[in-house]
Structures are given as C-alpha cells and as structure tokens.
Amino acid sequence: TTTAANIVVSGGNVADVAALITSGYASGMTTTMGNGVTLDGVSLNSYGGNIVIRGKSSTSVTTYTSSIGAVSNANGIRAHGNITVDTGAGKLSMWGYAQSSSGSSNGIELSTSASTYKSSSSAADAITMQGTAANNAAADAWGIYFWNSSSVLASNGGGISITGSGIKNSGVVIPSGSAVLSTGGPITITGSGYGAGFNAVDIAGHVGLKSGINTGASTSDITLVGNKFAL
C-alpha cells in the first residue's frame, strides 16, 4: 500500500495502543531469539505515518539464523542484511534495552550491510534512537552501535537525536562508513555509561553532511553530549 499509516513494532497490552508506542516493548526469548526486535533484510515504509520500534532483550544470549548466517545475540534491537526504514513525512522512533548476562547484548545494533533509516519530517524530533546496555557481565554491551554501512537521514530539515548508554563499551559508536545526516535540523548525540577504555561518543563516520548522499547542503547544529569522546 501507499497509504499513510503508522507502523508499530512493540509489545504489551494490545488494547492500549498508546502504551505500545510510549512504554511497551517486544521481548526477547531465552531459547530461540534473544533480541527484542530483529530486523532481517526488511523494508518498512509508512508513507507519512510514524514508525515506532521498541525492543528489550532476554536475560541470556541465544543463537539463531539470520540473513548473514548463525549469530548469537541478545540485543534490544538488532538489524541484519540490507535494511530500509522510511517514514516519508512521518517520524521514526527506535528504543532498545539490552540486559543479557552473556554474549553480545547491545541496546541497538544496526546492520553490517548497507542500510538507511530515513524521515522527511521537518519536526525537531523527526528521528530518535535510544539504546541502553545494562548488564556489565555481557561479552559486549554497547549502547548504540552503527557498524560501517548504516545511514540515518533527515532529508527535510528535521532533527535527529541519538542517545546511548553502554555499561561496558561505548555509549554511541558511529564508525567510518556510517552517517548521521540532516539538511538543517539539530543533530544531538548523547553518550553515557561507558566502560574502562571506551568513550561516551565515538565518531569516525560522517555527521551533518556526506558527499554523495542526496541531502544537498546542511545547516544543522551538531551537539555532542558526554564526558569522553573519540572523534
């Protein structure tokens, strides 16, 4: 369909849609899928509706098969393969909470393959991502990890807010090859809770503007919040 409609990936009392959007979450399982939400080679298009994705991991890691083969994760939100999430003029909100005591347990971990998360909303909160890794016993506990092929794009002057807390590793990691871009809206990246030898915010990719991606010029104010950075 090309009709504007909201897409909500969450969990809880289905009779209370408002709670699914604000406080509900899909829960990971301890036997077959430890991730709260797994995006595996999927395209989500809401054509002007909002997209909300909320996931909370299981308390122990599981091994499962994805488009890239067998993996062991217990993340709040985990993406595999080529992902497209496009809200049109709607807003995008992603919330991931990871709590496993073993394996890789990150708040939000995006894909190693080329992926785009896009909104043409002009609102200051066009795109929001919040990821928390809460268990120091996990092998990996990053707040938000982009990998090197994911782009977040506010194409119509909308704002972007990315907030990550990594109890063992860095709060927010935007590695080389990844990008957080807006044509004019504010970009705020906040990191906290990092472990020894890591950073609140770690950026080697592009923030604001990247050559070759169709955003034109950018007039975005960029704010980094944290007390230890790698830039």
Where are these regions (language model features)?
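Surface-exposed loop/turn motifs in large extracellular/passenger domains
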Residues: T1-L231
